[in-house]
Amino acid sequence: MHSFKLLLALIVAICTSCDAVPRGSLSDESNFKSYPVAQYEAANHRLLRAKDGKVRADEERLSSNPDSMLTRIKSFVNPGPFHELVRTATAIAERLKETVHSTLDHWLTIQRFNHLLGHCDHDSMDSAIVRGFHPSEFRVWLDLKSPLATEVVDSLDEWPKSTQLQSLLKFIKHYHSLLLPPPNHWAKVRASINPSHASSKPLFHDVYGIKEALEEMDHIIDQDLSVATMLEQKVSPLLYKVALEARELKTGKRIDRSKLNRFIKGYMAQYPSLDKFESMVNGYAPPGKFRKIPTFKGLDDDVINPPKYLNP
Protein backbone atom coordinates (compact mmCIF):
# COMPACT_ATOMS: atom_id res chain seq x y z
CA MET A 1 0.00 0.00 0.00
CA HIS A 2 2.84 2.34 0.87
CA SER A 3 4.52 1.62 -2.49
CA PHE A 4 1.23 2.33 -4.27
CA LYS A 5 0.98 5.76 -2.57
CA LEU A 6 4.55 6.59 -3.56
CA LEU A 7 3.85 5.58 -7.15
CA LEU A 8 0.67 7.68 -7.19
CA ALA A 9 2.54 10.71 -5.80
CA LEU A 10 5.22 10.28 -8.45
CA ILE A 11 2.60 10.19 -11.23
CA VAL A 12 0.92 13.34 -9.87
CA ALA A 13 4.28 15.15 -9.71
CA ILE A 14 5.09 14.21 -13.30
CA CYS A 15 1.67 15.36 -14.55
CA THR A 16 2.01 18.65 -12.67
CA SER A 17 5.41 19.38 -14.19
CA CYS A 18 4.14 18.54 -17.68
CA ASP A 19 1.22 20.91 -17.20
CA ALA A 20 3.56 23.74 -16.20
CA VAL A 21 5.50 23.57 -19.47
CA PRO A 22 3.49 22.18 -22.40
CA ARG A 23 5.46 19.80 -24.60
CA GLY A 24 6.92 21.63 -27.55
CA SER A 25 6.33 25.00 -25.96
CA LEU A 26 8.66 27.88 -26.64
CA SER A 27 9.19 27.93 -22.88
CA ASP A 28 11.06 24.66 -23.28
CA GLU A 29 14.73 25.63 -23.17
CA SER A 30 15.53 23.29 -26.08
CA ASN A 31 13.17 25.20 -28.38
CA PHE A 32 13.47 28.67 -26.90
CA LYS A 33 16.54 29.89 -28.77
CA SER A 34 15.35 28.67 -32.17
CA TYR A 35 12.62 31.32 -32.43
CA PRO A 36 13.39 34.98 -33.13
CA VAL A 37 10.44 36.11 -31.03
CA ALA A 38 10.82 33.59 -28.24
CA GLN A 39 11.39 36.25 -25.61
CA TYR A 40 7.75 37.30 -25.84
CA GLU A 41 6.60 33.78 -24.97
CA ALA A 42 8.27 33.90 -21.58
CA ALA A 43 6.67 37.23 -20.70
CA ASN A 44 3.19 36.14 -21.77
CA HIS A 45 3.25 32.44 -20.93
CA ARG A 46 0.23 32.39 -18.63
CA LEU A 47 -1.84 34.49 -21.01
CA LEU A 48 -0.97 32.22 -23.91
CA ARG A 49 -1.85 29.03 -22.09
CA ALA A 50 -5.34 30.42 -21.48
CA LYS A 51 -5.69 31.07 -25.20
CA ASP A 52 -4.18 27.79 -26.32
CA GLY A 53 -7.48 25.96 -26.74
CA LYS A 54 -8.89 28.66 -29.00
CA VAL A 55 -5.71 28.81 -31.06
CA ARG A 56 -5.73 25.06 -31.63
CA ALA A 57 -9.39 25.23 -32.66
CA ASP A 58 -8.56 28.02 -35.11
CA GLU A 59 -5.74 25.93 -36.54
CA GLU A 60 -8.04 22.97 -37.16
CA ARG A 61 -10.73 25.17 -38.70
CA LEU A 62 -8.32 26.97 -41.02
CA SER A 63 -6.45 23.81 -41.98
CA SER A 64 -9.64 22.01 -42.97
CA ASN A 65 -10.00 24.11 -46.12
CA PRO A 66 -7.50 22.92 -48.78
CA ASP A 67 -7.88 26.19 -50.69
CA SER A 68 -7.36 28.45 -47.69
CA MET A 69 -4.59 31.02 -47.47
CA LEU A 70 -3.15 29.02 -44.57
CA THR A 71 -2.75 25.89 -46.71
CA ARG A 72 -1.08 27.84 -49.50
CA ILE A 73 1.24 29.68 -47.11
CA LYS A 74 2.25 26.48 -45.30
CA SER A 75 3.25 24.95 -48.62
CA PHE A 76 6.27 27.24 -48.88
CA VAL A 77 6.78 28.54 -45.32
CA ASN A 78 7.48 26.11 -42.52
CA PRO A 79 9.00 28.01 -39.59
CA GLY A 80 7.91 25.59 -36.88
CA PRO A 81 4.82 24.28 -35.11
CA PHE A 82 1.89 26.36 -36.28
CA HIS A 83 0.13 26.74 -32.94
CA GLU A 84 3.34 27.77 -31.18
CA LEU A 85 3.96 30.53 -33.71
CA VAL A 86 0.37 31.73 -33.44
CA ARG A 87 0.60 31.82 -29.66
CA THR A 88 3.78 33.87 -29.83
CA ALA A 89 2.29 36.25 -32.39
CA THR A 90 -0.81 36.63 -30.24
CA ALA A 91 1.40 37.61 -27.32
CA ILE A 92 3.00 40.34 -29.40
CA ALA A 93 -0.40 41.65 -30.41
CA GLU A 94 -1.53 41.68 -26.78
CA ARG A 95 1.61 43.56 -25.81
CA LEU A 96 0.83 46.21 -28.42
CA LYS A 97 -2.82 46.21 -27.37
CA GLU A 98 -3.73 45.48 -30.99
CA THR A 99 -6.98 43.54 -31.08
CA VAL A 100 -8.10 44.22 -34.64
CA HIS A 101 -6.42 41.21 -36.25
CA SER A 102 -7.53 37.60 -36.27
CA THR A 103 -5.29 34.77 -35.09
CA LEU A 104 -4.38 33.92 -38.68
CA ASP A 105 -3.46 37.54 -39.36
CA HIS A 106 -1.04 37.40 -36.43
CA TRP A 107 0.63 34.33 -37.87
CA LEU A 108 0.88 35.83 -41.36
CA THR A 109 2.28 39.03 -39.85
CA ILE A 110 5.10 37.06 -38.23
CA GLN A 111 5.90 35.54 -41.61
CA ARG A 112 6.12 39.02 -43.08
CA PHE A 113 8.46 40.10 -40.27
CA ASN A 114 10.70 37.11 -40.86
CA HIS A 115 10.77 37.82 -44.59
CA LEU A 116 11.48 41.51 -44.14
CA LEU A 117 14.28 40.95 -41.63
CA GLY A 118 16.48 39.77 -44.48
CA HIS A 119 15.54 42.50 -46.93
CA CYS A 120 15.46 45.80 -45.08
CA ASP A 121 17.23 47.86 -42.45
CA HIS A 122 16.13 50.70 -40.19
CA ASP A 123 16.79 53.38 -42.79
CA SER A 124 15.29 51.58 -45.81
CA MET A 125 11.60 51.99 -45.12
CA ASP A 126 10.24 52.22 -48.65
CA SER A 127 10.12 48.45 -49.08
CA ALA A 128 8.40 48.00 -45.72
CA ILE A 129 5.78 50.60 -46.59
CA VAL A 130 5.12 49.39 -50.10
CA ARG A 131 4.74 45.82 -48.82
CA GLY A 132 1.79 47.05 -46.81
CA PHE A 133 3.25 47.21 -43.30
CA HIS A 134 1.36 49.29 -40.77
CA PRO A 135 3.29 51.37 -38.19
CA SER A 136 2.17 49.09 -35.35
CA GLU A 137 3.68 46.14 -37.23
CA PHE A 138 6.84 48.10 -37.91
CA ARG A 139 7.29 48.64 -34.18
CA VAL A 140 7.19 44.88 -33.58
CA TRP A 141 9.72 44.41 -36.36
CA LEU A 142 12.02 46.94 -34.67
CA ASP A 143 11.63 45.07 -31.40
CA LEU A 144 12.57 41.80 -33.06
CA LYS A 145 15.54 43.30 -34.88
CA SER A 146 16.89 45.11 -31.86
CA PRO A 147 19.84 43.52 -30.03
CA LEU A 148 18.13 44.76 -26.86
CA ALA A 149 14.98 42.76 -27.59
CA THR A 150 15.52 40.49 -24.60
CA GLU A 151 15.55 43.55 -22.34
CA VAL A 152 12.43 45.09 -23.86
CA VAL A 153 10.13 42.58 -22.19
CA ASP A 154 11.54 43.26 -18.74
CA SER A 155 11.74 47.03 -19.08
CA LEU A 156 9.29 48.56 -21.55
CA ASP A 157 10.20 52.03 -20.30
CA GLU A 158 13.65 51.63 -21.82
CA TRP A 159 12.25 51.19 -25.33
CA PRO A 160 11.45 54.87 -26.09
CA LYS A 161 14.96 55.92 -25.09
CA SER A 162 16.52 53.95 -27.94
CA THR A 163 16.86 54.98 -31.57
CA GLN A 164 13.98 52.64 -32.34
CA LEU A 165 11.43 55.31 -31.43
CA GLN A 166 13.00 57.76 -33.84
CA SER A 167 12.97 55.09 -36.55
CA LEU A 168 9.32 54.38 -35.83
CA LEU A 169 8.29 58.03 -35.96
CA LYS A 170 10.21 58.40 -39.22
CA PHE A 171 8.29 55.44 -40.55
CA ILE A 172 4.92 56.89 -39.48
CA LYS A 173 5.65 60.26 -41.03
CA HIS A 174 6.88 58.67 -44.25
CA TYR A 175 3.88 56.30 -44.27
CA HIS A 176 1.37 59.13 -44.07
CA SER A 177 3.24 61.33 -46.54
CA LEU A 178 3.10 58.55 -49.13
CA LEU A 179 -0.62 58.02 -48.62
CA LEU A 180 -1.29 61.63 -49.53
CA PRO A 181 1.68 62.66 -51.71
CA PRO A 182 2.10 65.90 -53.68
CA PRO A 183 0.70 66.02 -57.23
CA ASN A 184 2.70 64.12 -59.85
CA HIS A 185 4.80 62.39 -57.18
CA TRP A 186 4.17 58.87 -58.50
CA ALA A 187 5.03 59.93 -62.04
CA LYS A 188 8.37 61.24 -60.80
CA VAL A 189 9.04 58.01 -58.90
CA ARG A 190 8.21 55.94 -61.97
CA ALA A 191 10.53 58.03 -64.11
CA SER A 192 13.35 57.71 -61.56
CA ILE A 193 12.99 53.92 -61.49
CA ASN A 194 13.15 53.45 -65.25
CA PRO A 195 12.83 56.55 -67.48
CA SER A 196 12.25 54.49 -70.63
CA HIS A 197 9.20 52.82 -69.09
CA ALA A 198 7.84 55.79 -67.17
CA SER A 199 4.51 55.72 -69.00
CA SER A 200 3.94 51.97 -69.11
CA LYS A 201 5.68 50.15 -66.26
CA PRO A 202 3.47 49.71 -63.16
CA LEU A 203 4.80 51.50 -60.11
CA PHE A 204 7.14 49.34 -57.96
CA HIS A 205 6.32 46.31 -60.15
CA ASP A 206 9.21 43.85 -59.69
CA VAL A 207 11.31 46.66 -58.21
CA TYR A 208 10.49 45.86 -54.59
CA GLY A 209 9.41 42.28 -55.25
CA ILE A 210 5.71 42.80 -54.55
CA LYS A 211 4.25 41.59 -57.82
CA GLU A 212 2.10 39.12 -55.88
CA ALA A 213 0.81 41.86 -53.58
CA LEU A 214 -0.26 44.00 -56.51
CA GLU A 215 -1.97 41.02 -58.11
CA GLU A 216 -3.89 40.50 -54.88
CA MET A 217 -4.94 44.16 -54.97
CA ASP A 218 -6.12 43.60 -58.55
CA HIS A 219 -8.51 40.95 -57.28
CA ILE A 220 -9.79 43.37 -54.63
CA ILE A 221 -10.41 46.01 -57.31
CA ASP A 222 -12.22 43.44 -59.48
CA GLN A 223 -14.47 42.47 -56.56
CA ASP A 224 -15.37 46.15 -56.07
CA LEU A 225 -15.35 45.74 -52.30
CA SER A 226 -16.98 48.45 -50.24
CA VAL A 227 -14.88 50.84 -48.16
CA ALA A 228 -16.27 49.28 -44.97
CA THR A 229 -15.26 45.80 -46.12
CA MET A 230 -11.74 46.90 -47.05
CA LEU A 231 -11.34 48.59 -43.67
CA GLU A 232 -12.59 45.45 -41.92
CA GLN A 233 -10.18 43.26 -43.87
CA LYS A 234 -7.27 45.64 -43.16
CA VAL A 235 -6.46 46.22 -46.81
CA SER A 236 -3.42 48.47 -47.21
CA PRO A 237 -4.62 51.80 -48.68
CA LEU A 238 -1.17 52.44 -50.09
CA LEU A 239 -1.07 49.16 -52.01
CA TYR A 240 -4.64 49.75 -53.13
CA LYS A 241 -3.63 53.17 -54.45
CA VAL A 242 -0.60 51.74 -56.24
CA ALA A 243 -2.73 48.97 -57.78
CA LEU A 244 -5.23 51.52 -59.07
CA GLU A 245 -2.45 53.49 -60.74
CA ALA A 246 -0.93 50.31 -62.16
CA ARG A 247 -4.28 49.42 -63.70
CA GLU A 248 -4.61 52.90 -65.16
CA LEU A 249 -1.22 52.51 -66.80
CA LYS A 250 -2.24 49.13 -68.18
CA THR A 251 -5.66 50.17 -69.51
CA GLY A 252 -4.99 53.81 -70.33
CA LYS A 253 -8.27 54.74 -68.63
CA ARG A 254 -8.73 57.06 -65.67
CA ILE A 255 -10.23 55.38 -62.57
CA ASP A 256 -12.59 57.25 -60.28
CA ARG A 257 -10.78 58.25 -57.07
CA SER A 258 -13.82 58.83 -54.88
CA LYS A 259 -13.71 55.37 -53.27
CA LEU A 260 -9.94 55.64 -52.72
CA ASN A 261 -10.40 59.00 -51.00
CA ARG A 262 -13.14 57.62 -48.74
CA PHE A 263 -10.96 54.60 -48.01
CA ILE A 264 -7.96 56.70 -46.99
CA LYS A 265 -10.13 58.98 -44.87
CA GLY A 266 -11.74 56.02 -43.10
CA TYR A 267 -8.38 54.31 -42.61
CA MET A 268 -6.78 57.38 -41.07
CA ALA A 269 -9.71 57.80 -38.71
CA GLN A 270 -8.92 54.40 -37.19
CA TYR A 271 -5.40 55.33 -36.10
CA PRO A 272 -3.94 58.13 -34.00
CA SER A 273 -2.16 61.10 -35.48
CA LEU A 274 1.58 61.47 -35.11
CA ASP A 275 1.14 63.81 -32.12
CA LYS A 276 -1.14 61.36 -30.33
CA PHE A 277 1.19 58.50 -31.11
CA GLU A 278 4.14 60.39 -29.64
CA SER A 279 2.14 60.96 -26.48
CA MET A 280 1.24 57.29 -26.29
CA VAL A 281 4.73 55.81 -26.63
CA ASN A 282 6.77 58.66 -25.22
CA GLY A 283 4.55 60.38 -22.68
CA TYR A 284 7.38 61.61 -20.46
CA ALA A 285 9.42 63.22 -23.27
CA PRO A 286 9.39 67.01 -23.78
CA PRO A 287 6.98 68.09 -26.55
CA GLY A 288 8.57 68.06 -29.96
CA LYS A 289 11.61 66.07 -28.88
CA PHE A 290 11.35 63.66 -31.82
CA ARG A 291 9.72 65.94 -34.37
CA LYS A 292 12.89 66.81 -36.27
CA ILE A 293 12.92 63.88 -38.63
CA PRO A 294 15.76 63.54 -41.16
CA THR A 295 14.95 63.54 -44.86
CA PHE A 296 15.01 60.23 -46.67
CA LYS A 297 17.84 59.47 -49.03
CA GLY A 298 16.73 59.44 -52.64
CA LEU A 299 13.40 61.16 -52.08
CA ASP A 300 12.41 64.75 -52.79
CA ASP A 301 12.08 67.06 -49.80
CA ASP A 302 8.48 67.88 -50.70
CA VAL A 303 7.59 64.21 -50.36
CA ILE A 304 8.88 64.14 -46.80
CA ASN A 305 6.77 67.04 -45.56
CA PRO A 306 3.75 65.43 -43.90
CA PRO A 307 0.12 66.31 -44.62
CA LYS A 308 -1.25 69.23 -42.62
CA TYR A 309 -3.32 67.01 -40.34
CA LEU A 310 -0.09 65.67 -38.83
CA ASN A 311 0.91 69.17 -37.72
CA PRO A 312 -2.29 70.79 -36.37
Curated annotation (Swiss-Prot):
Q: In chain numbering, where does the motif RxLR-dEER fall?
A: 46-61
Keyword annotations: Host nucleus, Secreted, Signal, Virulence
Q: Which locations, inside or outside the cell, does it occupy?
A: Secreted; Host nucleus
Cellular component GO terms, alphabetically? extracellular region; host cell nucleus
Signal sequence region: 1-20
The answer to whether the entry has keyword Lyase is no
UniProt similarity note: Belongs to the RxLR effector family.
Please quote what the entry notes about the protein's domains.
The RxLR-dEER motif acts to carry the protein into the host cell cytoplasm through binding to cell surface phosphatidylinositol-3-phosphate.
Per the entry, what this protein does is: Secreted effector that completely suppresses the host cell death induced by cell death-inducing proteins.
Q: Can you say what this protein is called?
A: Secreted RxLR effector protein 14
UniProt source species = Plasmopara viticola
